[in-house]
Design a protein with these regions (language model features):
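Feature detects intrinsically disordered, low-complexity acidic/polar segments
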Residues: 1-206
């Protein structure tokens, strides 16, 4: 569901922010030393491990996003506009972790033991810049997903209101008391609350 994907994306964005701070610290250490010691290399290994974990988790979220898109494409109630937005999100997901970033990670891992300090410093700076871009793209994805969710919720709410209106119409025409006035009022109150909540979320996205 969108909620699940949004929650995971928020987690990954927070992880990336922390990783960028760790890389900043590492860069400061590298600038203050002429040579790297064993501790520096261990720190570097840990940073690379964290980076890999984030990338692997991201790829899992990407799979979930594809499944969500397939579900929406096969659902006849999904509007053309929502489908277009979903496709836009999917394209952004595919762009997030570029091949150059993966290659840079591999190179860093291979050369960790023998890389000169200056070269490592440059590569860490590149990694930091890539992570900044990655974070910005994740933020864009989050904004689009949240917007998509609000629009879907609103469409579902309109369907529920139409359904309730139809039931009331039938009740009046047929004198059918299967849906009492009290029931109708309660359902309408619930839908009004849902609408208020959706409009509040929408206001927060603008």
């Amino acid at each position: 569901s969108e909620n699940n994907i949004i929650s995971k994306l928020e987690d990954k964005t927070n992880d990336l922010e922390q990783l960028r701070k760790d890389i900043e610290e590492m860069l400061k250490d590298l600038m203050s030393k002429k040579e790297l010691d064993w501790t520096d290399k261990e720190k570097m290994k840990q940073l690379l491990e964290k980076q890999k974990e984030i990338q692997e988790e991201w790829e899992k979220v990407q799979e979930e996003q594809k499944e969500l898109q397939e579900f929406m494409e096969n659902n006849e109630l999904t509007s053309e506009e929502l489908l277009k937005k979903q496709e836009q999100i999917n394209k952004l997901f595919e762009e997030v972790i570029p091949d150059e970033m993966k290659k840079m990670m591999e190179e860093l891992e291979k050369m960790l033991g023998e890389m000169p300090r200056e070269k490592m410093q440059q590569m860490m700076q590149d990694l930091k810049n890539s992570n900044k871009e990655l974070q910005e793209m994740m933020d864009r994805n989050l904004a689009l997903l949240e917007q998509l969710k609000v629009e879907k919720d609103l469409n579902e709410l309109i369907d529920k209101m139409n359904d309730l209106s139809e039931k009331l119409k039938n009740m009046n025409e047929n004198n059918n008391d299967s849906l009492t006035s009290e029931d109708a009022k309660n359902q309408f109150d619930e839908l009004s609350k849902e609408l208020d909540s959706i409009m509040e979320k929408n206001k927060g996205l603008q």
